[in-house]
Amino acid sequence: MSTYRKTYKNQSKRFNNGNNSNSTSTELTNLVEMFPDWEADELQGLLSENDNSLEIVIDLIVNNKVSKWEPIKKEKHKKKEHKDDTTDSVTGNANGASNSGSSNSTTASGDRRLNNKAKASTSSRPPKRQQHPNAAHKKNEKTERSKASTVSTTTTSATSSVTKESVPPSNSWAAALSNDKPKKQETKSEASESIPSSNDGGDAETVPEVEQAETLEESHQEPENVEEPIESVSEQSQPENTKPVLKSAAIPEPKQGSWASAIAPKTKPKPKTVSKPVPQPEESKPEEHIPVQEEAQPVESILEDKPAVEAVQPVQPPVEDEPVEAPAASSVAAVADASFSEPTASSIIDQQPQVVLPTTQQQVDSVGISFGSLSVDAGEPKEAAEVIQDETISEQVQPEQQQQSQQQPLQEQQRYGLYNQQPTQQRYQQNNYQQQGQYSKQQQQQQQQQTSQPTQQQQQYDYYGQYQQQQYPQQTAQPGAQFGGYPGFDYNAYNQQAFAAAAAASPAASHVATIGGGVGGYNQYAQQANSADSTQSPIVNQSTLQQQQAAVLAAQQQQQQLPTPFGYPAYYNYYYNNPYFNAGGLGSTGFSAPQQGTQQGTQQQQSQQSGQQQQQVSSANQQGSVSSNSFGAQQQYYNPNQFNSRYPGYSYPPQQQNQQSSQHTSGQSQQGAQTTSDGASDGQQTSQQGQSSQQPQQQQQQHAQPVPQQHMMPQYGAYQQYPQYGYQDSNQYRGGWY
């Protein structure tokens, strides 16, 4: 907002219209050509009223839906004059003289003062012209332009002063529009001209220098804005204008570089000049840095010469910001240059102690950092005092910087620390990485840790893989059958992809262990992992149980289990047992058939007996239970008793011994439920009673631990180790849910 304040002193209308005219310059010019009898102002008003829609305005005019503003003919003449001025200013001709002859002489004298001081400052600053070849080229162009514009600017500045004096909208507004039409920069220049003209009374001298500083700023910023070659070019060309014609016109052109800069930067310009050398080093332009150093010194001398400019100078903290920004913005380019830019910055600091990065950085905390011209106005008074301090500090710091110049690269990193320290380190690193197009620390670390990360990744994936192997054995069903029951989806490709990706990712992902690296391995492990991993963490010995149940499960699980995609808990299974309704062939596979259940129950009972003997009964039972999704599903939903929670995903997994007993109970109860088709499997005892005849031993052993069903010790917090975790069979509902 602060950037706009001065704009509205004299230029509120001009810039408001100027902005519109800038946006609608093409439409407006077309309309002016199409309807020469219409006033540009009227057309502009129509455009602004109709969202700058050329077609709508033409339609309105052609259909006489809109009529010219007839009554005000005098204003039309004035507007015509404005048009002339705009066209003249657009062409860059010095037409302002017609509007103000005496004002030209008066403003010309003011402009001459500006030119003298500006030239003095520019003479001290000429290396800036050398800073950019583009600047030199466009400087030549704009020097010519500035020559024309100097006449026009003397006239326009005179006219702007006249507009201040008499008809502020007339020349400056039309000039602003005309400049806006051809070039926003010119509008800015005239606007800035009107600004200095407004300031001509007492601030005219200060303002021209400020403008010079702005031009310098922008020239400096241009290296900063190398990413923004347009602005930098305009700004560079503008510095030429400022240098050859330090009149307000020349200054406004650098303002043209950035509209906000044209408005507010006057306060900044010198600080940016100071900042300018800094950004240049960051862009690693040592040649420019040296002139910038020279320039920065004259800038400070000028600043010292004029406290008002010093008030402008306080923006030096933004200078820090800008170098910071420049590394950020130009980090890509600067990273390549970073090795150069920072040492150049340090050497420049030595050469240019006046650019006090450390002190300004230190002060940046105290001084409100303003990026761009936003906070310039608000910060001016404080910044003025602080700028004085900055100058003194910079003077003090100059020897310090010389001393610190060697240290400075580190200090810059440190003082920029929040901004640059890591970025600079990363820049050096990124110099390597940018070549590879890698910037993120993660990538760097990955490159650095590529050796270490594969293991880490494996560990990470293993971390989940344990869950997945243990908790999602559901996943290990036949690949074809994985979602077979789930309507409308063919998950085979996804399963294969998931398997391949997971297998590539980590051993956990290799779902020969869990889901199965391949369909063959997938089926195999569906047998084994479902049986073994379903209940057990890989910690428990699964080999015996897996082997025991592998044969049984091989025939059954391959057909029976529907795995969710790798690592994916079958949530829809929780809510919708889509694959588990007989649709998936699960029921057809015989989950519903108590025969398999009984067979599995007996087999599981056998394995459970051996497992109990091995303390692995948990794996045995769940292997059996998992092996038949019916069992796993029963354990999940079908037996709410298992952990006194019918929500398997949230019940705490029992410790393995408890798991063994509880899973025996649950698994057997489920088995018994299937075998006995007891809906009462909710009561494990009932299901166990069904099984009790089959497995009195296990029941006795299991009853020894009746509570473990409620095991509150989560081995894996929210995750159950059980294949139950994802499984629900149609049996689940047959079992008596419904």
UniProtKB/Swiss-Prot annotation:
Residues 1-12, 126-140 have a biased composition (Basic residues). Residues 180-191, 282-292 have a biased composition (Basic and acidic residues). It is found in: Cytoplasm; Nucleus; Chromosome, Telomere. The gene is DEF1. Ubiquitinated. The lineage of its organism: Eukaryota, Fungi, Dikarya, Ascomycota, Saccharomycotina. Residues 202-216 have a biased composition (Acidic residues). Belongs to the DEF1 family. This is RNA polymerase II degradation factor 1. It comes from Candida albicans (strain SC5314 / ATCC MYA-2876) (Yeast). Homodimer; may form higher order oligomers. Interacts with the large RNA polymerase II subunit RPO21; the interaction is direct and serves to bridge RPO21 to the Elongin complex in a manner dependent on transcription stress. Interacts with RAD26. Recruits the ubiquitination machinery to RNA polymerase II for polyubiquitination, removal and degradation, when the transcription-coupled repair (TCR) factor RAD26 fails to efficiently displace stalled RNA polymerase II. Also involved in telomere length regulation. Binds DNA. The keyword Nucleus applies. Residues 631-645 have a biased composition (Polar residues). Residues 16-25, 91-109, 148-164, 394-460, 595-630, 647-677, 684-711 have a biased composition (Low complexity). Keywords: Chromosome, Cytoplasm, DNA damage, DNA repair, DNA-binding, Nucleus, Telomere, Ubl conjugation, Ubl conjugation pathway. GO terms for cellular component: chromosome, telomeric region; cytoplasm; nucleus. Signal peptide: none annotated.
